[in-house]
């Protein structure tokens, strides 16, 4: 049941990620963030003694992740406009931005893994890391299954 919920959530987010205004993106991210918290709490078990610390850090993490998410959505929108006629220069510029966004996301996850481990313990931090990577990978898969390769006809 959890996999079905996650799949539906990812599909909903992916479908709505294209060609939206910043206001719509922010609204979607807030809705997704609330639903995502339910998924995270289904897998991360901080226990009563660490719940408040975990939730505070997770909320802080989500705010920063959502800012990075806006960049990823903008990059997907750019790709949607250019994929069928993308030049080498456009591909290089786009990939530079994609790789930069991925690196920033990875740094953010590592940073919050360390913060959560310090505030709770290594098990809770590992659970956070695992569920976060699972969700991000699932979203990435859903997106890439639905977009064509550069120059594909």
Model-predicted segments: where are they?
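Amphipathic alpha-helical segments
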Residues: 39-119
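Charged, compositionally biased N-terminal leader segments and the immediate start
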Residues: 20-24
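Amphipathic, charged alpha-helical segments and their helix-to-coil junctions
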Residues: 25-27, 31-37, 43, 106-153
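A short hydrophobic/aromatic micro-motif that marks alpha-helical segments and, especially, helix-coil
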Residues: 15-17, 62-65, 102, 136-139
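Short hydrophobic "helix-edge" motifs at membrane interfaces and signal-peptide entry regions
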Residues: 4, 37-38
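Sec-dependent N-terminal signal peptides
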Residues: 4-19
């Amino acid at each position: 049941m959890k996999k079905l919920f996650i799949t539906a959530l990812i599909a909903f987010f992916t479908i709505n990620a294209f060609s939206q205004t910043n206001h719509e993106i922010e609204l979607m991210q807030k809705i997704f963030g609330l639903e995502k918290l339910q998924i995270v709490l289904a897998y991360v078990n901080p226990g009563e003694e660490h719940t408040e610390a975990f939730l505070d850090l997770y909320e802080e993490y989500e705010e920063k992740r959502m800012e990075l998410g806006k960049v990823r959505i903008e990059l997907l929108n750019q790709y949607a406009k250019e994929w069928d006629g993308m030049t080498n220069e456009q591909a290089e510029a786009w990939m530079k931005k994609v790789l930069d966004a991925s690196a920033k996301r990875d740094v953010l996850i590592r940073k919050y893994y360390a913060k959560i481990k310090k505030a709770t313990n290594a098990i809770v931090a590992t659970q956070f890391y695992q569920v976060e990577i699972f969700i991000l990978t699932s979203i990435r898969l859903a997106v890439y299954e639905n977009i064509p390769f550069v120059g594909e006809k």
